[in-house]
Amino acid sequence: MAWNSFATPLIGKAVRAASRLAHGGGSAFPGKIVERIDPQFLARTLQQLPLGVVLVSGTNGKTTTTRMVASMLESLGLKVFTNPTGSNFTRGVVSSLLAEVSLGGKLDADIAVLELDEAYAVHFVKQVQPDYCLLLNVMRDQLDRFGEIDNTAKLLSKAAEATTGTVVLNREDPRIARLADVTHTEDGVEVRYFGLDKSLRSFFPSDDDMCTTVDTESAADTEASVGIDLSESAESDENIEIGDASAIAKTGEHAEKSENAESAEQLPADVTLLAVGDHRASFGIDGETYETGVKLEGVYNLYNAAAALAA
């Protein structure tokens, strides 16, 4: 066994202890140091796990969904390693590993459930191919980081492509659902979907749905402030100007979003959120309906629960 199999945990734990004394809490700094001195530590340690690695990523809901998946697996009697306090960058995962491994580099766990930032998921899968991958959504929350929303989807596609076992996708998010195209189903990779009952879709708008709402409200505001009925000007091809061309483009976008909704209907969801109530929810799983109490606050966390159940 290489010397760093013993030296890295010792050095990393020492740095972690010093960092906790200095800052009084969890820190990704020890992970950064270990990545420098032993780039193979992450892959070497996670390869010990008999049941492999579950990767969870997406714009929103990563932390809650990761905790739910880990909790479900623990309820089955499995020992689960996760990154609850570290950052969701690769160095955060390494820092969390340093807290769990023995001085000999042994990780006492059956499976890992890891939350990864969209950008760092790409770096992670270059080192460790996940056995399972759960991709939640792509939203415009972080355009300052990724520029275009499609860039975020491209980052997540790398995680889906690298997965060797099962990829779980959000049926309601067209950018996520399309990632089935990059999975290696010819090599036995399974694709599963979680989704919403049609009656609930208005309560869980996708990024495209929210943009549609903004566009509609903007058009209404323009119509009211300028005093022009935009629907009348759209009836005459002779009156088309630059502003009308933009409106026509938006009409095409809305038609595409309608097609996306129809496509979602056609995809078979392995887990469907059927109904929500006061701390209760109904899920459709493999054709059966299950109603359960839910302690989590927030309606979106019920949809995250559907994602966790599908994993």
Task: Report residues per predicted region.
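Flexible active-site lid/hinge loop adjacent to a nucleotide/diphosphate
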Residues: 104-212, 293-295
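Short gly/ser/thr-rich secondary-structure transition/capping motifs
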Residues: 35-40, 95, 113-117, 150-151, ...
